[in-house]
UniProtKB/Swiss-Prot annotation:
Annotated stretches, region: Disordered: 122-148
UniProt source species: Homo sapiens
Pfam families: Il2rg
Ranges annotated as biased composition (Basic residues): 123-134
Protein name, as recorded: Uncharacterized protein C22orf15
Length: 148
């Protein structure tokens, strides 16, 4: 079966999960223009993060793992890059779909939570009267009526 993986500026690709995970991962890296050593994961619409790398690093037997054993068929996923922190720094999760906040605000919040970032600084959009990337008009910015 297939899944839809979203990345870039609204790009998406249908991926057949009935293949080895190592091939699926290499294909996604190539499509997204990532280096071969980039660590990636898929974030499902329900907020579940599926690491595509950890299973491959556990041993040669895991290299035979099929994509459909980890991924739900017909689901939509966002491609995520995992950036390992050096020393005591925490791991960061970076969405490879531009404007994730506009498309999936709940998933953007989940990535911030996984990265250990506070969401306090990200609520400014709500306070500024922004809804899904569109500014509401304030009373001072309404067009003025001409003389009657």
């Amino acid at each position: 079966m297939f899944i839809k993986v979203m990345f870039g500026a609204g790009c998406s690709v249908l991926v057949n999960t009935s293949c080895r995970l190592v091939n699926l991962t290499a294909h996604l890296r190539q499509k997204a223009g990532l280096p071969p050593d980039a660590t990636i994961a898929l974030l499902a619409e329900d907020g579940n993060l599926v690491s595509l790398e950890e299973d491959l690093k556990e041993g040669a037997s895991r290299a035979q793992t099929m994509g459909n054993s980890l991924l739900k068929e017909r689901a939509i996923y966002v491609l995520v890059r995992i950036i390992k922190g050096e020393d005591m720094a925490s791991t960061r999760y970076e969405s490879l779909l531009e404007n994730l906040d506009d498309h999936y605000p709940e998933l953007a919040e989940e990535l911030r939570r996984l990265s250990g970032l506070s969401s306090v600084g990200h609520n400014w959009r709500k306070r500024m009267g922004t809804r899904r990337g569109r500014h509401e008009q304030s009373p001072t910015s309404r067009p003025r009526k001409g003389p009657d």
